Design a protein with these regions (language model features):
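Long, basic N-terminal domains or extensions that often function
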Residues: 1-247
Length: 247
């Protein structure tokens, strides 16, 4: 089992957009992985004003195999009185890419059964991540330079890793890698992510808390500590706390 990371680094996104963006990002990641028949255990989403990221744990090495069944003409139409295949069943078999002899007879009809072996996950991921990127929706989008593809804000970097292997994704002349941007004032300006599993810890070591709930809790603790120090009571506005969490 592997861990998948996909981070999109942008210019500052509006705080009021962030909860919806991260919810949409998580749902898209889960939906696209399921549609691609790539088993996974859990998807977690992370965000700061300049980044959105998801980490999918327990990613299987290969797609699940698929069996598809197509119902064809009735046996009365498929074969003549002597049991020879008619043009109807020959056309059906040809359209399904199978021989007439491979058709299954059941319940008075013929069926084409096709088995498709699952592909290798890392081969499928570039297209899947590109699909997620282009499927994200926002209250408003921006276009920049001469690019046709718009986004909530211009994006300047992407990190896409399956464990420690870079998954190639490219959009608007930005190519994925294993390097993210650091805090504007603290720590390194560029940070190498050694593996998808180490994403959260690596950023925290560089003064970036990408876990939204952890960041909100820390802000609350600091507000309450200041209030207690001043000998007062802190009346915290939850809406304001939510906004500050994304600033």
């Amino acid at each position: 089992m592997a861990t998948l990371l996909y981070e999109i680094g942008t210019e500052e996104m509006p705080a009021q957009y962030m909860p919806g963006i991260l919810k949409n990002y998580k749902e898209l990641a889960e939906t696209k992985l399921k549609e691609a028949r790539i088993p996974f255990e859990k998807v977690s989403v992370y965000g700061t004003p300049r980044r959105m990221a998801f980490v999918a744990e327990g990613i299987a090495d290969r797609q699940e195999d698929m069996t598809a069944e197509s119902k064809g003409p009735s046996l009365k139409i498929a074969f003549d009185a002597d049991g020879n295949p008619t043009k109807a069943v020959q056309g059906f078999a040809r359209g399904q890419g199978v021989e007439v002899s491979a058709l299954e007879k059941r319940d008075g009809y013929v069926y084409a059964i096709k088995h498709t072996k699952g592909g290798e996950t890392k081969v499928l991921l570039p297209a899947l991540l590109d699909d997620i990127l282009h499927s994200l929706s926002f209250p408003k989008t921006m276009r920049w330079a001469d690019y046709d593809f718009g986004f909530v804000r211009p994006f300047h970097w992407m990190v896409a890793l399956l464990d420690s292997e870079v998954i190639p994704v490219e959009a608007n002349d930005v190519k994925s890698g294993n390097v993210t941007r650091g805090h504007r004032f603290l720590g390194s300006q560029t940070i190498t992510i050694p593996s998808a599993e180490a994403y959260v810890k690596t950023l925290e070591e560089n003064f970036i808390i990408v876990d939204v709930e952890k960041r909100r809790a820390l802000i609350r603790e600091q507000i309450e500590a200041l209030g207690k120090k001043a000998g007062g009571h802190t009346a915290i506005s939850e809406d304001l706390l939510d906004e500050v969490t994304y600033l």
